[in-house]
From Swiss-Prot:
The lineage of its organism: Bacteria, Bacillati, Bacillota, Clostridia, Eubacteriales. Keywords: ATP-binding, Cytoplasm, DNA damage, DNA excision, DNA repair, DNA-binding, Excision nuclease, Metal-binding, Nucleotide-binding, Repeat, SOS response, Transport, Zinc, Zinc-finger. This is UvrABC system protein A. GO terms for cellular component: cytoplasm; excinuclease repair complex. It comes from Clostridium acetobutylicum (strain ATCC 824 / DSM 792 / JCM 1419 / IAM 19013 / LMG 5710 / NBRC 13948 / NRRL B-527 / VKM B-1787 / 2291 / W). ATP binds at residues 32-39, 640-647.
Length: 939
């Protein structure tokens, strides 16, 4: 059994006692309908058990820091290797995380720049070299006479620890004072205790000198002593002013600016020596945004133009009104004039303050008084309140009027100017990281280095180049290393982790991947498959959960799980080669692979009318000042290779611009000149794959609103009326009807010391969530718990005579979710299922026919059979007169659209233009469109 993984009796989620044997060291694909149990078998069984066994091998001391993993519900698994999961979850929300840091390429770059980087003066740009003791003394002697200075030897710079031995060594060397974290201590007299978990700066105080004629000899001795003690560094502290750092290593002879010893940590935007001290290494600052303070400049102050003041602030007896009257008198500021008609000087006074003192008339205690008032301006006042306030509420209110802007000091580079003055091949580390990955490889190839530098950097350059090439092979050549990880799509972040794993060259590992083809254009699919095969060829087992036909055909072994979804799934329908799957009549996947089932091209398409939503001059990220039209009342697909600008155009500009204008959203859209045709829509809805709720309390019944009607129904029964129960009695979120032992959760958490927490059904309500009295109320012999455990299909039959409930449930069935239980916790729903519940909710609402729906890759997690259902829903929404805009790579969806907007031609800087737009047939005729070339085969 060494060459096989044997699973016996898997019962996780909907798996029905599954037995399966999978070959090791092969490329295996798990496929099946959305919700059939693929992820339950791959992630919740195989990966969970592989991880758990590895954790169990660690000591109990180590396990308490790592947290525990539950044992999956499976009899046994044989032949399991340590498992690594590469899933769709994005790489966290930390703004410090970049593509470079996630892939660890940035660590090698820091090493490269530290070893062969050429330092320049950050002021004059001149290449700088090491400073002698005489040069240091001459620079210090230029200070004004009678200036008091301290000569310090920086022995510790930003290192954790108590440093007891070091302080003892300083004392033994004859020094009586030491400066720690900016404070001077007497070594003999003061008790020095440092927090070992904090980073400290420790400097031995070598001498205190007053600058005057004839002091050069003493200063030279002191500087030499400090340089010797601190390995080439000396700090001159001008009493009451800032420190001057000198180095025997590098300094500018003209400007006198020194750079400390060049080390890899200098290039880290997380380390105190390297990071910009204004933005703290993040590259952006949260600042008051003028456009959010005055969202509508066509209004006057009296009409409520100043958003933070609200409507009720401008009563004539208010202090603000008194100040405005004084401004009006002194600076001719007309409070009844639209803000857009103010000249620049007047607007600046309103926002940033008046230079002169104002005389403000104000009625206080029924007595009119005149106050002298220095008006600081709306924005300056908000800044001050934000800085001074300790109230989280006030801070969060002011944050509504703030946005992230590039740091004024580092311009978004995150590092100090001294660090950015160090170059390799005339580029600093930020300039290198800002290049697209494909250009970085050619830059490294053409680097001209001295023989000495070639020898030093050979191994580092090899590591950087191989990792960059792995990123290119998974279709990410358009990204740059400075890109924030949180701005990546799920597919991009997964492929970055895949490239990182290939870079680590581990062997004998079980890799489990979740739809790596998501977000990838058909053109790049072959490279991705080759990359996965490469991972297998070096000696690993790959299990890939996938619906993509090319990936399924490329697999060595295929497992089809079904036959249906949810309670109708959880069984192995077929397992074997591609031919085995094709020959299995029960396999829906097989039927699509053989062409027995397929998604048909629509016989006729809707034609674009006269109405369009038009974006003019879009130039956010890589968009090159493009103009684009979206026909109103049509189903439009936005296509193009990965990184061509689809998400920027649709999510950052179209959605955010309309959301700001229609819903007065606080989020700023990307850069564009104007947007026309807004009058054609009255509502904009983004239907994404985020969960319908974050806790097990939210479920399909609560999200779609059907649970409110059901609770009213139970409250209207004869028994409920007799007992005086209202609809709230049947909610598990509030006191009254719910079981108070488990607070309506149905489960109770039992904490274990060295094992994972155990969740057991509540022994009071037996997992039913409600108390005994509530469960005694029945409708057609079913209590509220029985109802929540019904599938949508069963509930449809149960409520067939109640149209209000039936219509809402029917839309859930129409989107292919008949198998889902009404009370199924949202945490147990896949992204595709969550998105379809949102679609069902939209379908159940009364349509105005003027809604714009935006969907970003809705086929994620969907089997071809589910894609067929999705297309019919999108067509239904469009038939109701709505406008649907979808970002998609799936050719089945693209061929069914009425209209296509294709971006390209490539990703990153080589993208961002509109290649073509029109019907699928028109796009297919365009020879410069990659989408068109693949579409041609489908039509």
């Amino acid at each position: 059994m060494k060459d096989k993984i044997v699973i016996k009796g898997a019962k996780v989620h909907n798996l029905k006692n599954v037995d399966l044997t999978v070959p090791r060291n092969e490329f295996v694909v798990f496929t099946g309908l959305s919700g059939s149990g693929k992820s339950s078998l791959a992630f919740d069984t195989l990966y969970a058990e592989g991880q758990r066994r590895y954790m169990e091998s660690l000591s109990s001391y180590a396990r308490q820091f790592l947290g525990q993993m539950d044992k999956p519900n499976v009899e046994y698994i044989e032949g399991l290797s340590p498992a690594i999961s590469i899933d769709q979850k994005t790489t966290g929300r930390n703004p410090r995380s970049t593509v470079g840091t996630v892939t660890e390429i940035y660590d090698y770059l820091r090493l490269l720049y530290a070893k062969i980087g050429v330092p320049h003066c950050p002021n004059c740009g001149k290449e700088i070299s090491q400073q002698t003791v005489d040069q240091i003394v001459d620079s210090v002697m230029k200070l004004e006479e009678r200036t008091k200075i301290q000569v310090l030897a920086p022995v510790v710079r930003g290192r954790k620890g108590e440093h007891t031995k070091l302080i003892a060594h300083i004392k033994k060397s004859g020094f009586v004072r030491v400066r720690i974290d900016g404070e001077v201590y007497e070594i003999d007299e003061d008790e020095i205790k440092l927090d070992k978990n904090k980073k400290h700066h420790i400097e031995a105080l070598v001498d205190r000198i007053v600058i005057k004629q004839g002091v050069e000899g003493r200063l030279t001795d002191s500087v030499e002593t400090a340089l010797k003690l601190a390995e080439g560094l000396v700090v001159i502290n001008v009493m009451g002013k800032e420190d001057m750092l000198f180095s025997e290593n590098f300094a500018c002879p003209d400007c006198g600016i020194s750079i400390g010893e060049i080390s890899p940590s200098m290039f880290s935007f997380n380390a105190p020596f390297g990071k910009c001290d204004v933005c703290d290494g993040i590259g952006t600052l949260l600042e008051i945004d003028e456009d959010l303070v005055i969202p509508d400049k066509s209004k006057s102050i009296m009409e409520g133009a100043i958003a933070p003041w609200g409507e009720g602030r401008l009563k004539e007896e208010s202090w603000t009104f008194g100040v405005l009257k004084a401004l009006s008198k002194k600076y001719k500021l007309d409070i009844n004039k639209p803000i857009e008609d103010y000249d620049e000087k007047t607007l600046n006074i309103l926002l940033y303050g008046a230079p002169d003192v104002l005389k403000v008339n104000y009625v206080k205690d029924s007595q009119e008084m005149v106050f002298n008032h220095h008006y600081e301006g709306i924005i300056n006042q908000m800044k001050r309140r934000y800085m001074e306030s300790n109230s989280d509420y006030i801070k969060s209110e002011i944050e509504n009027y703030m946005s992230n802007n590039p740091c004024p000091k580092c311009k978004g580079a995150r590092l100090k100017k001294e660090v950015l003055a160090i170059t390799v091949g005339n580029k600093n580390i930020f300039e290198f990281c800002s290049m697209p990955i494909r250009e970085e490889v050619s830059f490294i190839d053409t680097l001209e280095l001295s023989n000495k530098h070639k020898i030093i950097s050979a191994q580092i350059v090899k590591e950087i180049k191989s990792r960059l090439e792995f990123l290119i092979n998974v279709g990410l050549d358009y990204l740059n290393l400075a890109r924030e990880a949180r701005t990546l799509s799920g597919g991009e972040s997964q492929r970055i982790r895949l490239a990182t794993q290939i870079g680590s060259s581990l062997v004998g590992v079980l890799y489990i991947l979740d739809e790596p083809s998501i977000g990838l254009h058909q053109r790049d699919n072959d490279r991705l498959i080759a990359t996965m095969k490469n991972l297998k060829d070096i000696g690993n087992t790959l299990i890939v959960v996938e619906h993509d036909e090319d990936t399924i055909k490329a697999a060595d072994f295929i497992v089809d799980i079904g036959p249906g979804a949810g309670e109708h799934g959880g069984e192995i329908i077929a397992a074997g080669s591609l031919e085995d799957i094709k020959n299995c009549k029960e396999s829906i996947t097989g039927q699509y692979l053989t062409g027995v089932k397929k998604i048909e091209v629509p016989k006729e398409r809707r034609e674009a009318g006269k109405n369009f939503i038009e974006i003019v001059g879009a130039k956010e990220n890589n968009l090159k000042n493009v103009n684009v039209k979206f026909p109103v009342g049509l189903f439009t697909c936005v296509t193009g290779v990965s990184g061509s600008g689809k998400s920027t155009l649709v999510n950052e500009i179209l959605y955010k611009a309309l959301n700001k204008k229609i819903n007065r959203s606080k989020l700023n859209p990307g850069k564009y000149k104007s947007i026309n045709g807004i009058e054609n829509i009255d509502k904009i809805i983004d239907i994404n794959q985020s969960p319908i709720g974050r806790t097990p309390r939210s479920n399909p019944a609560t999200y779609t609103g059907v649970f409110d009607i059901i609770r009213e129904l139970y409250a209207s029964t004869k028994e409920a009326k007799l007992r005086g129960y209202k609809a709230g009695r049947f909610s598990f979120n509030v006191k009254g009807g719910r079981c108070e032992a488990c607070k309506g959760d149905g489960i109770v958490r039992i904490e274990m010391q060295f094992l994972s927490d155990v969740y057991v059904p509540c022994d009071v309500c037996k997992g039913k969530r409600y108390n005994r009295e509530t469960l005694e109320i029945k409708y057609k012999d079913k209590n509220i718990d029985d109802l929540l455990n019904m599938t949508v299909e069963d509930a449809l039959k149960f409520f067939e005579n109640l149209p209000r409930i039936k219509n809402k449930l029917q839309t859930l069935a129409d989107v292919g979710l008949g198998y889902v239980r009404l009370g199924q916790p949202s945490t147990q729903l896949s992204g595709g299922e969550a998105q379809r519940i949102k679609l069902a909710y939209e379908l159940s609402k009364r349509s105005t026919g003027k809604t714009l729906y935006i969907l970003d890759e809705p086929t994620t997690g969907l089997h071809t059979d589910d894609v067929k259902k999705l297309i019919s829903i999108l067509q239904r929404l469009t038939d109701m007169g709505n406008t649907v805009v979808v970002i998609e790579h799936n050719l089945d969806v693209i061929k069914c659209a009425d209209y296509i907007v294709d971006l390209g031609p490539e990703g990153g800087e080589k993208g961002g233009t509109i290649l073509c737009s029109g019907t699928p047939e028109q796009v297919a005729q365009n020879s410069s469109s990659y989408t068109g070339q693949y579409l041609k085969k489908m039509l």
